[in-house]
Amino acid sequence: MLLKTDVASKLIEELNTETVFSLFGGKLKIDEGTVVSWIIMAVFLIAGILLTRGLKVEGKLSKRQLFIEMCVDKMRSFFHSVMGPDGDRYIPWMMTVAVYIGACNMCGIFGFKSPTKELNVTVGLALTSIILVQYAGIHKKGTKGWLKSFAKPVPIVLPINLLELVIKPMSLCFRLFGNIIGAFIIMKLIEAVVPVAIPVALSLYFDIFDGFIQAYVFVFLTSLYIQEAIED
């Protein structure tokens, strides 16, 4: 009973969004997840500037440039294989979201609260991704063709296809949020039972390996939705 109460209290504490500071006389409250997201963005911005300095188009390339190009090419090849050539225009977005979610899930290693533990963050990510999916369909088929696609392959499936407009973002949102929170609950249960050694190893697993898996699943499903939206 004590273990259950302790884990429940820690879960409630983790789910609570603490206001770090306020703007405009307290009307706009900035919570911890937002601040951590800003830190992640700032780190990526600085890293991007530093890593892309002195890049060459021809001649002898540095090991740094070769490594960066290899990583980008691997990611581009992956998304291209899922979405096809018509989806290449959306690859930069997919790569950005993948790196951002991966970093959010990993920031617990450094003592920060993961922004993906906040439902409003996962809702925002899911909504922007689904809006991109619908935009891809409209861009490829036109507004009239996009509307007609809801009645394919037969008109009777129209209600189901319309329902997917709600189901898909909810699925993306709660899958990411639920897996991150689930990992947190498992870690707290293990820490309460075996407080030494094992929790450290599992923490690295959930913060690094599982964090990357969740980022992969999110962008993979989004790329599949885009592929479905742009296919003839």
Each language-model region and where it sits:
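Selective transmembrane helix interface/packing segments
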Residues: 1-232
